[in-house]
């Protein structure tokens, strides 16, 4: 929890006022047994109704003051816990925004969701109970023991012996509970990851009739979570009964010892009543402490998991502004670039190996190759979604690791393979990167992306609502909206990562023709599976198993690149290859 102390500081007033009000409540609660003893000794035994009446009224007033103090504590504790929880959740969200793809891969999205929700709630709950129960219980415990000892030292020693036993039991339970709560949170991560994955791929599950299989997989992880929760709950379940048993044994012992004392008038009846009340307060306080310490054990696990995220240094470090001239995207070069996801420099772990090429403004660079060749990984290095393991990517003479991320990414437009759309209108999705875009600009890029006609036919046009992840749109429609979104920001470097795979040949042809006039001032990268998508590019890079095995124009590659010839032959047939060679 020490790493999260900084989130408490802004709400120090609530953190102080809450316990302060609780101290008043404890003080009033400690008065009640004394007042009860006075009523019994001087009112009931002496048969003085006036004492009973006036002392009874005083007890009611004390109870009301205790109530007011308790409510005040609850209000301040709630405000502190809710605000602290909100700040931690926001800090986690902001931290995740700084993560590279590699950092997100490390934690897994399901685990990050658990940390931002369930773990924050655990810490939030701890703050609440700490400002209430963890103040009330120790103070009431100490106060009750002191009052009991002052009333009767011998009886008080019985109470102290009982407390030592209870504390020993509590330490044992705490020692075994911490690792169990840690395992529960890990199992919850697995459940959330499975749910998220299943919901994201529900259409695939249904299409392949895999509901039964997925249900079984969920059953296994859910069962693991349930069993871990049951094991942890056993310690919680043992806590209260054991404490209650020891408390009752203590009360019986006190009554057995004090009974003869009352008969001999060595102890007044009212004092015995007050003493038993103090014993009950002390022991119930310890039970409360044990319950709260279980919360502490559980929250410590959550706090550590939160701190793991907050203390993670992003694998991609943002560069400071050097005051150099603005990035124009005139020239880009890859120099001996190697990349592996685990930053290993061994050849067998490398996804990309010794990548070298250059491109200048006005050039279109197409990248083609088999699935898994490293095409998408290569272009993801340009906006620093991942960082190179060795070598460098240089834009306008500057290593991109020395360019502030905001400046770098502001000049790069990327249409990802997965055309992700946000919940909202089509207009909102197109203007995502330029929220103040004019209507005519939105329509212009939509026309270039060959999506304007489709949008115009919708009942609400550009204000048509898009479902989560664009579920109410086809793959081709989502791709074209994503292309329009990227074109609107007018990037210096345009990256289209297999972004026309869902388009038919005619629509793709129209899109390529419309883009020609727009991208003449850009450096454009096109990743494609189809040769027809990159045949007009000034430079085509052919990739195979993480390396560039060919570079040149379409005609040059047909003449000297075996891999390119194989791809061409698989798509167009032997006759066309022969024809190109004539």
Q: Can you say where each PLM-predicted feature lies in the sequence?
A:
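Short intracellular "coupling" helices and adjacent cytoplasmic loop segments at the cytosolic face
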Residues: 45-47, 76, 82, 90-114, ...
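Hydrophobic alpha-helical transmembrane bundles that constitute the permease/transmembrane domains
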Residues: 23-31, 64-71, 123-126, 130-142, ...
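Transmembrane helices of ABC transporter permease
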Residues: 10, 14-27, 62, 68, ...
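Membrane-integrated ABC transporters
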Residues: 1-31, 36, 44-59, 65, ...
């Amino acid at each position: 929890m020490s790493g999260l102390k900084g989130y408490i500081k802004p709400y120090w007033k609530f953190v102080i006022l809450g316990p302060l009000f609780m101290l008043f409540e404890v003080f009033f609660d400690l008065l009640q047994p004394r007042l009860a003893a006075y009523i019994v000794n001087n009112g009931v035994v002496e048969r003085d109704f006036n004492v009973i009446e006036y002392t009874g009224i005083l007890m009611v007033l004390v109870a009301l003051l205790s109530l007011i103090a308790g409510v005040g504590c609850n209000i301040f504790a709630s405000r502190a816990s809710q605000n602290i929880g909100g700040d931690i959740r926001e800090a986690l969200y902001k931290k995740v925004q700084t993560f590279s793809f590699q950092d997100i891969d490390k934690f897994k999205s399901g685990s990050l969701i658990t940390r931002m929700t369930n773990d924050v709630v655990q810490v939030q709950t701890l703050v609440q109970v700490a400002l209430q129960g963890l103040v009330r219980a120790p103070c009431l415990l100490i106060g009750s023991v002191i009052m009991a000892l002052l009333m009767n030292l011998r009886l008080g020693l019985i109470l102290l012996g009982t407390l030592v036993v209870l504390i020993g039991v509590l330490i044992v339970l705490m020692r075994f509970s911490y690792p169990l709560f840690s395992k529960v949170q890990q199992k919850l991560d697995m459940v959330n990851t499975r749910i998220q994955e299943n919901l994201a791929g529900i259409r695939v599950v249904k299409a392949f009739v895999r509901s039964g299989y997925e249900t079984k997989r969920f059953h296994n992880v859910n069962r693991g979570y349930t069993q871990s929760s049951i094991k942890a709950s056993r310690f919680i379940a043992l806590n209260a009964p054991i404490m209650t048993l020891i408390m009752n044994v203590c009360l019986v012992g006190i009554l057995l010892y004090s009974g003869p004392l009352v008969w001999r008038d060595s102890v007044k009846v009212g004092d015995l009543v007050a003493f038993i009340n103090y014993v009950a307060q002390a022991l119930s306080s310890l039970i409360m402490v044990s319950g709260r310490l279980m919360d502490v054990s559980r929250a410590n696990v959550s706090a550590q998991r939160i701190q793991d995220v907050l203390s993670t240094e992003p694998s991609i470090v943002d560069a400071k502004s050097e005051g150099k001239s603005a990035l124009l995207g005139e020239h880009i070069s890859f120099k001996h670039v190697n990349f592996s996801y685990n930053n290993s420099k061994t050849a067998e772990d490398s996804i990309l190996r010794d990548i070298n090429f250059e491109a200048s403004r006005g050039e279109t660079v197409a990248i083609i190759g088999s699935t898994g060749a490293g095409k998408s990984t290569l272009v993801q290095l340009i906006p620093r979604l991942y960082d190179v393991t060795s070598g460098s990517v240089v834009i306008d003479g500057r290593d991109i690791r020395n360019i502030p991320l905001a400046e770098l990414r502001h000049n790069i437009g990327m249409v990802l393979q997965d055309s992700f759309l946000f919940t909202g209108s089509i207009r909102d999705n197109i203007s995502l990167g330029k929220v103040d875009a004019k209507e005519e600009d939105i329509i212009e890029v939509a026309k270039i992306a060959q999506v304007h006609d489709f949008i115009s036919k919708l009942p609400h046009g550009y204000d048509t609502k898009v479902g989560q992840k664009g579920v109410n749109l086809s793959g081709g429609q989502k791709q074209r909206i994503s292309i329009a979104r990227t074109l609107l920001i007018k990037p210096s470097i345009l990256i289209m990562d297999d972004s026309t795979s869902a388009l038919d040949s005619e629509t793709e042809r129209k899109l390529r023709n419309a883009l020609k006039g727009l991208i003449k001032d850009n450096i454009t990268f096109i990743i494609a599976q189809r040769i027809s998508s990159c045949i007009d590019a000034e430079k085509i890079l052919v990739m195979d198993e993480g390396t560039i095995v060919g570079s040149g124009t379409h005609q040059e590659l047909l003449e000297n690149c075996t891999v390119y010839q194989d791809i061409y032959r698989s798509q167009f047939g032997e006759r066309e290859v022969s024809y190109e060679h004539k």
